[in-house]
Curated annotation (Swiss-Prot):
Homology family: Belongs to the UPF0398 family.
Protein's recorded name: UPF0398 protein RBAM_020340
Disulfide bonds: none
HAMAP family xrefs: UPF0398
Signal peptide per UniProt: none
Pfam families found in the cross-reference section: YpsA
Listed SUPFAM superfamilies: MCP/YpsA-like
Highest taxon, organism lineage: Bacteria
Length: 182
């Protein structure tokens, strides 16, 4: 696997409303654990759309991992121009910091938001252009990642496309591991 698409819950779907929420330590630890194993297997690119939450946390985690794995690259391909325009200032700043460090940045449709079709196009593009999907998602807790998952499941039926999940159980394990070592 060379290209990994990453998505998952938005912060509000997890009850996270501050960028210093303690839960982020565990979420990023779970993402890091998965990314390390993929890097060891040849991962070169992480593909995100720049969506708040899991995607930006994955990019931040990837940037931290660059100290050990300088060959790891991050591509941010947004579904449309200006997706961050209505976000609160701290979220915009986080987004801009992620973009500033990205190895590749592009807008898929080259237009501002027009319709939900742009999100469907983004999902289809990500699944087509990636070798696997990693998502922070638990089927017991439905949310926005389900649309990307549905697209990935369609592809999996035709060619065995790998889908990897970070579930609530994985997050509990990250908490327990952190507690064990502190």
């Amino acid at each position: 696997m060379k290209v990994l698409a990453v998505t998952g819950y938005k912060p509000f779907e997890l009850g996270i409303f501050k960028q210093d929420d303690q839960a982020l330590v565990y979420i990023k630890k779970a993402i890091e654990t998965r990314l390390r194993s993929f890097i060891d297997e040849g991962l070169e690119w992480i593909l995100i759309s720049g969506q708040l939450g899991t995607e930006l946390w994955a990019a931040e985690t990837a940037y931290d991992l660059r100290e050990e794995y300088p060959e790891l690259k991050v591509a941010v391909i947004t579904p449309f121009y200006g997706q961050e325009e209505k976000w609160k200032e701290p979220n915009k700043e986080m987004y801009e910091a992620v973009l500033a460090q990205a190895d590749y940045e592009e807008s898929l449709t080259h237009r501002p938001y027009e319709s939900p079709l742009q999100f469907r196009q983004k999902n289809a593009f990500f699944i087509e252009k990636s070798d696997a999907l990693l998502l922070l998602y638990d089927p017991e807790m439905e949310g926005s990642p389900k649309y990307m998952l549905q697209q990935a499941e369609k592809r999996r039926e035709t060619d065995g496309y790998p889908i990897y999940s970070i579930t609530m159980d994985d997050l509990r394990a990250a908490v327990e591991e952190e507690d064990f070592f502190t």
